[in-house]
Curated annotation (Swiss-Prot):
Belongs to the SlyX family. Residues 48-60 have a biased composition (Polar residues). This is Protein SlyX homolog. It comes from Cupriavidus pinatubonensis (strain JMP 134 / LMG 1197) (Cupriavidus necator (strain JMP 134)). Residues 48-67 are annotated as: Disordered.
Length: 67
């Protein structure tokens, strides 16, 4: 009976450690997601605030020099 109890306590300790590690990993990933979303919003604002500039700089709309 004592051996089984010790084995269960050891397994529980490992599971608690694993759970803590996984919680830290999830928290870190959430921080990374938040940062990526913030960067995406900033990039989206840049792209949508100047749509005419992108169209004007498109080389397909330029007349070749020999015309």
């Amino acid at each position: 009976m004592d051996d089984r109890l010790n084995e269960l306590e050891i397994k529980l300790a490992f599971q608690e450690d694993l759970l803590e590690t996984l919680n830290l990993t999830v928290a870190r990933q959430q921080q990374q997601l938040d940062l990526l979303q913030e960067q995406f919003r900033a990039l989206y604002q840049q792209v949508t605030s100047a749509p005419s500039t992108a169209a004007e700089s498109n080389p397909q709309h330029e007349i070749p020099p020999h015309y």
